């Protein structure tokens, strides 16, 4: 009887241990890696804030949509914007998303969705804040936060559009 209890406890411990290891791995945040003409930027996705936007960005990244797209609007002290395949600020993937506004405060490195006047017009364009952009909080969907490479973001050429625009050479999901 004692041996049976030991076996049951051992099996239970192994199952619970495996469960905790699996849950820990699955709870790791997804990260988008942007290889830009200035260097690498890593963005931790925030599905708890904007699940539909995170799903769409993930889909576009996996399709290679962002590869070769320029940073078409870069305003010093404010943000760098990309995600328009036409490079004009008027293009997108053709699929609008409904707003997922939250009270997550826009700080340095916050990544939000660009949109037109219609709150439900976000598509594929996004921007990265150079510093606090608190006035955007609750008005633009946040889907990520730069966790590495803000020094790279700060080096992106300025302009609307820049005379010599930097680009996303490739975008991928981090393994």
Functional labels for PLM-detected ranges:
Residues 2-175:
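Cyclophilin-like peptidyl-prolyl cis-trans isomerases
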């Amino acid at each position: 009887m004692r041996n049976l209890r030991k076996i049951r406890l051992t099996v239970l411990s192994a199952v619970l241990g495996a469960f905790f290891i699996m849950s820990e791995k699955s709870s790791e945040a997804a990260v988008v890696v942007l290889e830009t003409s200035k260097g690498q930027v890593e963005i931790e996705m925030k599905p708890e804030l904007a699940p539909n936007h995170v799903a769409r960005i993930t889909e576009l990244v996996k399709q290679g949509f962002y590869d070769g797209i320029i940073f078409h609007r870069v305003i010093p002290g404010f943000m760098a914007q990309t995600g328009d395949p036409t490079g004009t600020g008027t293009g997108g993937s053709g699929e609008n998303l409904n707003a997922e506004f939250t009270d997550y405060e826009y700080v340095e490195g916050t990544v939000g969705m660009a949109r037109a006047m219609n709150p439900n017009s976000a598509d594929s364009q996004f921007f990265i804040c150079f510093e606090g952009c608190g006035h955007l909080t609750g008005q633009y969907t946040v889907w990520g936060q730069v966790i590495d490479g803000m020094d790279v973001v700060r080096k992106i050429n300025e302009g609307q559009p820049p005379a010599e625009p930097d680009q996303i050479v490739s975008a991928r999901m981090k393994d």
